């Protein structure tokens, strides 16, 4: 069974075609600059294998339809194609940012589901309209092929009410559904399953803490295989310090800055989402640049690193106690989590008092695949597990189609 996974943005579209019998990625790619004078399509055949072949094409893509038509042409190309006809695709899985409280599982797309995506655009104004566009383009170009929506907020629907409610007037929840939703849910769900598999433990018994650390970062507390708490909130702004996002701050800062700087709500939103975090502290968003500046003696870069690590450790500690100290694994994933040994070492520094011990050599070694970086006598295994959101979406699509 072949599943196409689509992640549509406002001016871009990521895709991946998987053979689900083996979980092999047949091809993947990115169409970008859609709607601009010159678009670009980067297409990889057998990505991340010794047979990888890269094709780059430029063209004018007035809309996502033209971009996806070029993708289909590459998929079915007589010489370079990975399928003979688009009818070989059994289903299409779509990443959708926000489903609100209306959906708690991946769902087969119909008019009701598209209506939910539209309604939740107020909570995901940058992503939901683009995600819906991706669905409608797929319906147009792949008639008769079922589409499945996989929501980034799905995993957070498993939280108990005391975890997702804010201590605001209750009518704000009733009227506006203001609550914690959590994001990176597809990644956290995949990592929960992969962690259980790595440990040889039933998912229904798993108690773990997942650290999805990248330009956008979040953490998830997993109890009995489900989300028990998570760091992001109503929006992806809450929680950890990130590349350009401030993370959790005193809410009173917002009206204070608006008054003192004469800013509009939109300007403050931009300031907190796109001009804060590591960028606001030291002028860099890439951790490699931050580390390089720390080596040069840049005090603001050193401060940014310390604040980032501190925000992770504070959340880690709270989740440890939410799990009553009974934790099966601490798991690092995503760009920083998988590749930054300095951040991992700093996050785990001092945890020896809880019996959690890191193997410095193993932590500093780059390896592919899931692995432990803790010592054999560590009280809790510390793991690196590469995330795979596309595979999780594809597996969810297969599950929905099988119902």
From Swiss-Prot:
Pathway per the UniProt entry: Metabolic intermediate biosynthesis; acetyl-CoA biosynthesis; acetyl-CoA from acetate: step 1/2
Active site: 152
Disulphide connectivity of cysteines: none
Gene Ontology BP terms: acetate metabolic process; acetyl-CoA biosynthetic process
InterPro entries xref list: Ac/propionate_kinase, Aliphatic_acid_kin_short-chain, Aliphatic_acid_kinase_CS, ATPase_NBD
Reported cofactor(s): Mg(2+); Mn(2+)
Localization, UniProt: Cytoplasm
Binding site for Mg(2+): 7, 389
Positions bound to ATP: 14, 212-216, 286-288, 335-339
Record text on cofactor binding: Mg(2+). Can also accept Mn(2+).
UniProt function note: Catalyzes the formation of acetyl phosphate from acetate and ATP. Can also catalyze the reverse reaction.
Name recorded for this polypeptide: Acetate kinase
